[in-house]
Regions:
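FAD-site-proximal beta/loop scaffold in flavoenzymes
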Residues: 4-56
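Generic structural motif recognizing short loop/turn segments at the entrances and edges of beta-strands
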Residues: 22, 29-31, 83-85, 107-109, ...
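A structural detector for beta-sheet-dominated domains
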Residues: 36, 90, 100, 114-116, ...
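Non-transmembrane, interaction-prone segments in cytosolic or luminal domains
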Residues: 42-43, 63-64, 70, 74-76, ...
Length: 128
């Protein structure tokens, strides 16, 4: 893309026609774009957040993602790139999906996840 732009959309279900037009990889579980911890897709300079990634229960989470995306996009513009995110986030059968799908392992980051069913007295283990 030879231009900068900001596209805002309001809706619940991920619609990714623009993502597909740009060759962005979609996640089979979320039906949204795959992103790294900076909310950058697998296409450098193309970022995604909110319901275009996965359905959110609260707009607060969309706002938090958008804030992180804005910081990341500004860093990308300033530095010309972001740290490589080559660690794939994998889940077991009890977790439907996570966002992001890739992390760097060099910075703290937040993982959003959706479980397949409600759990009681459970423990979440994150390891590398």
């Amino acid at each position: 893309m030879d231009h900068y732009g900001l596209i805002l959309s309001v809706g619940l279900i991920p619609e990714n026609e623009l993502s597909l037009d740009e060759g962005v990889t979609l996640d089979a579980r979320t039906k949204g774009a795959t992103v790294d911890e900076y909310f950058q897709t697998d296409r450098p300079g193309i970022f995604a957040a909110g319901n275009v990634l996965h359905v959110h229960d609260l707009v607060d989470f969309v706002s938090m993602e958008a804030e992180k995306l804005a910081d990341s996009a500004a860093r990308y513009i300033k530095e010309g790139k972001l740290p490589a995110c080559e660690i794939q986030v994998k889940t077991d059968k009890n977790i439907n999906h996570t966002v992001p799908q890739r992390i760097s392992g060099t910075e703290d980051c937040c993982l959003s996840l959706r479980v397949n069913r409600p759990f009681k007295d459970c423990v979440l283990v994150v390891s590398h």
